[in-house]
Amino acid sequence: MTGLPFRIGYGEDAHRLAPGLPLVLGGVAIPHAELGAVAHSDGDAVLHAVADALLSGLALGDIGQYFPDTAAEWKGMDSRRILAKALELVEERGYRPVNVALVVTLDRPKLGPLRADIAASVAELLGLPAGEVGVSFKTSEGLALEHVQTRVTVLLGRVDD
């Protein structure tokens, strides 16, 4: 295998929120959410950002290239499929995720009680120990009450043959 032993990827995603829609973050349904993501897929901003981080680490573009929001076939799609495709592309090139750090900005509901669930879900989807997925939560301090945003950094390691 050739190439750098490590690569760093960065991903970001945001969705407007509206009443009557589910809110899913990191593959976890968020209970008691009054607002949910407005999106072509299920609107999981965490998994979208993780997928983009995986792709950017190897200069493979972004999820919009693989799952355009103009294609009817992706309407309502479970974002775990998006992440699985990004992971497949990374693994095909001889890399795997080593560590993930993610920050979710959301004013309400408070997500602290779900930190371990979100970390465990993302870790499982990536084949990592839960301790390799760091999850932080922030608020917008009232600046943007009706949106969710996620920023993610991923460390990719080359898999030696």
From Swiss-Prot:
The keyword Lyase applies. GO terms for biological process: isopentenyl diphosphate biosynthetic process, methylerythritol 4-phosphate pathway; terpenoid biosynthetic process. 4-CDP-2-C-methyl-D-erythritol 2-phosphate binds at residues 13-15, 40-41, 62-64. Its cofactor is a divalent metal cation. The keyword Lyase applies. Binds 1 divalent metal cation per subunit. It comes from the Bacteria. One of its GO terms (molecular function) is metal ion binding. Keywords: Isoprene biosynthesis, Lyase, Metal-binding. It holds the Pfam family YgbB. Its EC number is 4.6.1.12. Pathway: Isoprenoid biosynthesis; isopentenyl diphosphate biosynthesis via DXP pathway; isopentenyl diphosphate from 1-deoxy-D-xylulose 5-phosphate: step 4/6. It is an enzyme of class 4 (lyase). CDD domains: MECDP_synthase. It catalyses: 4-CDP-2-C-methyl-D-erythritol 2-phosphate = 2-C-methyl-D-erythritol 2,4-cyclic diphosphate + CMP. The record marks 40, 139 as: Transition state stabilizer. A divalent metal cation binds at residues 13, 15, 48. InterPro entries: MECDP_synthase, MECDP_synthase_CS, MECDP_synthase_sf. Homotrimer. Involved in the biosynthesis of isopentenyl diphosphate (IPP) and dimethylallyl diphosphate (DMAPP), two major building blocks of isoprenoid compounds. Catalyzes the conversion of 4-diphosphocytidyl-2-C-methyl-D-erythritol 2-phosphate (CDP-ME2P) to 2-C-methyl-D-erythritol 2,4-cyclodiphosphate (ME-CPP) with a corresponding release of cytidine 5-monophosphate (CMP). Belongs to the IspF family. This is 2-C-methyl-D-erythritol 2,4-cyclodiphosphate synthase.
